A protein has these predicted regions:
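Hydrophobic beta-strand anchors of alpha/beta hydrolase catalytic cores
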Residues: 59-60, 88, 132
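N-terminal "domain-start" segment that seeds a small globular fold
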Residues: 23-50
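C-terminal motif of bacterial Sec signal peptides marking the signal peptidase cleavage site
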Residues: 18-22
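Thiol-/selenol-based redox modules, centered on thioredoxin-like
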Residues: 83-85, 134-162
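Bacterial N-terminal signal peptides that target proteins for export
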Residues: 1-11
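Short, internal strand/loop/helix patches
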Residues: 104-138
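Structural microenvironment flanking redox-active thiols in thiol-disulfide oxidoreductases
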Residues: 71-107, 116-119
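Short active-site neighborhood of thiol/selenol oxidoreductases, capturing the structured segment around
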Residues: 49-71
Length: 162
């Protein structure tokens, strides 16, 4: 088959690759103090006080334990946060706490890990993951991303949130 005849298929394949690589969401991030509404239990079932995040920028990643892009993003976000003196929070929006614990062990994630019962997903209008909110030290969202972003993009977003 000549290359010209395969052009539509190649264009579609490239579009899928770019979409899978992640994209920045161009809508404004949610308004208001996110830390006032970021309430969910930790994977161990303990209560979480979101106000403990105040004073430093935070990356809040909404992930699924069965999403390979999410699993890949967790250690990259953790490294970006650690190297830029920021908090990192993983919010598992699907599955059970046991599944989340397996991902946390596999990725050696050391940040705060929460399990959402669907409340946060609905509140922030999350339809796909990974979805990341970058919060300033005051708890207000400065940026949001849909799809995997990688360490450098997340580090830049933390710097801009300061």
């Amino acid at each position: 088959m000549p290359l010209v005849a395969r052009a539509p298929q190649l264009i579609i394949a490239l579009a899928i690759c770019f979409a899978a690589a992640g994209c920045k969401k161009h809508e404004p991030p949610p308004e208001g103090d996110i830390l006032e509404t970021l309430r969910a239990p930790t994977v161990s079932g303990a209560a979480f006080d979101p106000h403990s995040l105040r004073g430093k920028p935070s990356l809040v990643l909404f992930v699924s334990p069965t999403c390979p892009h999410c699993v890949k993003e967790l250690p990259e976000a953790q490294k970006a946060a650690r190297e830029n003196d920021a908090n990192v929070v993983a919010v598992f929006i699907a599955g059970k706490a046991e599944n989340a614990k397996g991902v946390l062990e596999h990725t050696k994630f050391e940040g705060v890990a929460l399990v959402d019962d669907g409340t946060l997903r609905r509140r922030y209008g999350i339809r796909s993951v990974p979805y990341t909110l970058v919060l300033g030290a005051d708890g207000h969202a400065r940026e949001q991303f849909l799809g995997g972003q990688g360490e450098d993009t997340l580090a830049d977003a933390i710097a801009e949130a300061r």
